């Protein structure tokens, strides 16, 4: 059986508001990213078998940012489950004692992996393809948890337009910042199915150049949608002016 690993596609930024744009297989999760707050001690996610005819197995596990499987900080329960046609089940993510060793002043990134395993077929000369996906899982320590109705704002991300027209994003926040849109008039300059993620208290530069002095950015928020901001950069190599755009999807 061949395994088709789509982690690079998903992690690169297909985690946008429209799940229909993602090439999920039969098994789909109920969200495109996971936020785990320290005070909650765990989180739950629903998986649905979209097939109306076939049962599937779903295998789940946690990986670190280097792609290593890990049970030290978070475990999935159950790690393997059968879903009958059109069935929906719940997967729990439970923190372990070692979670206390993670930084208290910033998010830690993990990946929640789900692999769907189809039933064996009696047909000859048929290759079965098993889909595997990875969702970003952000563990958020108590010191930086948002209120229940809190909405992430991104004004603390400094944006600088450089001489060559490339853009630098200085992330002054304790959260991972993911850009799903950089462009003008609804046309993104990001390569297709890609995004740009800036880790807490760090910076990242765009690989593309010649960005105009006025443009928009869309940050992927906690709900998987895009929060848009208007950017105006009258002077190169200086911090740009930022204001909330009149749309939020």
From Swiss-Prot:
The gene is yqiH. GO terms for biological process: cell wall organization; chaperone-mediated protein folding; DNA damage response. Residues 1-25 form the signal peptide. GO terms for molecular function: protein folding chaperone. Belongs to the periplasmic pilus chaperone family. Coiled coil: none annotated. Could be required for the biogenesis of a putative fimbria. It comes from Escherichia coli (strain K12). GO terms for cellular component: outer membrane-bounded periplasmic space. The keyword Chaperone applies. It holds the Pfam family PapD_C. This is Uncharacterized fimbrial chaperone YqiH. It is found in: Periplasm. Keywords: Chaperone, Fimbrium biogenesis, Immunoglobulin domain, Periplasm, Signal. InterPro entries: Ig-like_fold, PapD-like_sf, Periplasmic_pilus_chap, Pili_assmbl_chap_C_dom_sf, Pili_assmbl_chaperone_bac, Pili_assmbl_chaperone_C, Pili_assmbl_chaperone_CS, Pili_assmbl_chaperone_N.
């Amino acid at each position: 059986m061949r395994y088709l690993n789509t982690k690079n596609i998903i992690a690169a930024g297909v985690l946008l508001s429209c799940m229909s744009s993602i090439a999920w297989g039969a098994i789909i999760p109920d969200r495109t990213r996971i936020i785990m707050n320290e005070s909650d001690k765990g989180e739950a996610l629903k998986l649905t078998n979209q097939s109306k005819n076939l049962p599937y197995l779903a295998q789940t596990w946690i990986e670190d940012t280097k792609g290593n499987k890990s049970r030290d900080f978070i475990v999935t329960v159950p790690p393997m489950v059968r879903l009958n046609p059109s069935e929906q089940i719940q997967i729990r993510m439970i923190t372990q004692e070692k979670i206390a060793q993670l930084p208290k002043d910033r998010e830690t990134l993990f990946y929640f992996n789900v692999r769907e395993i189809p039933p064996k077929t009696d047909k000859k000369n048929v290759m079965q393809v098993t889909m595997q996906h990875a969702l970003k899982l952000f563990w958020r320590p108590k010191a930086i948890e948002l209120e229940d109705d809190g909405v992430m704002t991104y004004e603390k991300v400094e944006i600088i337009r450089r001489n060559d027209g490339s853009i630098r994003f200085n992330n002054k926040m304790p959260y991972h910042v993911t850009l799903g849109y950089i462009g003008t008039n609804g046309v993104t300059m990001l390569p297709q199915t890609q995004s740009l993620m800036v880790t807490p208290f760090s910076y990242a530069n765009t690989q593309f150049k010649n960005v105009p002095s006025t443009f928009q950015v869309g940050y992927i928020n906690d709900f998987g949608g895009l929060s848009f901001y208007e950017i105006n950069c009258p002077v190169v190599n200086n911090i740009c002016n930022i204001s909330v755009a009149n749309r939020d999807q």
